[in-house]
């Protein structure tokens, strides 16, 4: 599937026990990660294999309806407005004509060394002299609603475009056997999501709790969920949310053991932070940050 949003490991339990087992295995065995930069908007660009033409666009290039693929400035004028249109014009003028399809996060226009495209502020060690700055992270072989994305993209800089290396993260040796065993023991008793309650409903509920800074405990998540939805028809139970919380803890343990090799400083609310410097002193805030930066 196109990388329209990041799938979070803890959400795997909402897709079934087998998917959750695969996510747990990935968390405890992964050695290399792709760092998700906090850029906006997402830019998709490359050569369309169907006609051989270079294009730029947003994630709307993967739409099932109202597909917005831009080959010219006129296409951009027709499909987009405002800041997004301005960014796409810069992208069309300055991106290299490559024979691949790449998704990247927009960081900004060159000429400076401090950028805050979204929540996280980035300080580069020196001024970026290229025209535009992007953080490429996913590649595709086609433009289709069901295109499969592949992480691990590293593009060479050009005269006009500065590409951030999003592959500069490795995992130190770590383990959490007790937490893994506890989570696996809960899986057979975790309720399955039924047809009367969509995955999107549960994701919205959990994301709302994270944004509000609520304490992420299984019982509290379940109680507030039952207050909104019919508990007899939603399928999920206390063990579902216990597994969700445990997998999120595993993810945070992994985040604690990530080492990056870049030299870009990161700031949130004016305070220095980085993957290797995030601690669990504020677990809810950390989980929000983890949602922003974590890719297997």
Residue ranges and their predicted role:
Residues 278-296:
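Single conserved hydrophobic/aromatic residue that forms the stacking wall/gate
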Residues 1-41, 49, 53-112, 227-234, ...:
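Active-site-proximal "nucleotidyltransferase
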Residues 268-277, 281:
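C-terminal structured domain segments
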Residues 185-258:
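Long, charge-rich alpha-helical interaction segments
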Residues 53-216:
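Covalent nucleotidyltransferase
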Residues 42-46, 134:
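Short beta-strand scaffold segments in enzyme catalytic cores
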Residues 48-49, 292:
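Residue-level detector of alpha-helical segments with a strong bias toward transmembrane helices
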């Amino acid at each position: 599937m196109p990388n329209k949003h990041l799938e979070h490991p803890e959400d795997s339990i909402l897709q079934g026990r087998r998917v959750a087992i695969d996510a747990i295995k990935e968390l405890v065995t992964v050695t290399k990660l792709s760092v998700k930069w906090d850029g906006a908007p997402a830019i998709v660009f490359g050569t369309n294999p169907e006609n051989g033409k270079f294009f730029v666009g947003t994630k709307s290039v993967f739409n099932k309806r109202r597909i917005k693929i831009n080959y010219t400035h006129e296409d951009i004028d027709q499909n987009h407005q405002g800041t997004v249109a301005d960014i796409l014009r810069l992208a069309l003028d300055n991106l290299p004509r490559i024979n691949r399809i790449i998704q990247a996060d927009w960081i900004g226009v060159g000429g400076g060394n401090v950028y805050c495209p979204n929540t996280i502020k980035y300080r580069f060690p020196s001024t970026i002299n290229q025209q535009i700055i992007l953080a490429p992270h996913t590649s595709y072989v086609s433009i289709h609603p069901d295109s499969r994305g592949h992480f691990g993209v590293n593009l060479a800089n050009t005269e006009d475009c500065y590409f951030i290396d999003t592959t500069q993260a490795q995992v130190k040796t770590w383990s959490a056997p007790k937490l893994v065993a506890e989570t696996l023991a809960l899986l057979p008793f975790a309720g399955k999501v039924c047809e009367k309650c969509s995955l999107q409903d549960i994701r919205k509920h959990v994301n709302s709790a994270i944004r509000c800074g609520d304490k992420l405990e299984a019982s509290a998540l379940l109680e507030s969920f039952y207050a909104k939805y019919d508990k007899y028809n939603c399928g999920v139970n206390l063990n579902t949310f216990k597994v969700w919380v445990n997998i999120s803890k595993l993810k945070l343990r992994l985040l604690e053991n990530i080492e990056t090799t870049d030299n870009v400083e990161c700031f949130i609310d004016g305070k220095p932070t980085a993957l290797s410097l995030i601690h669990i002193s504020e677990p809810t805030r950390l989980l929000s940050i983890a949602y922003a930066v974590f890719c297997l």
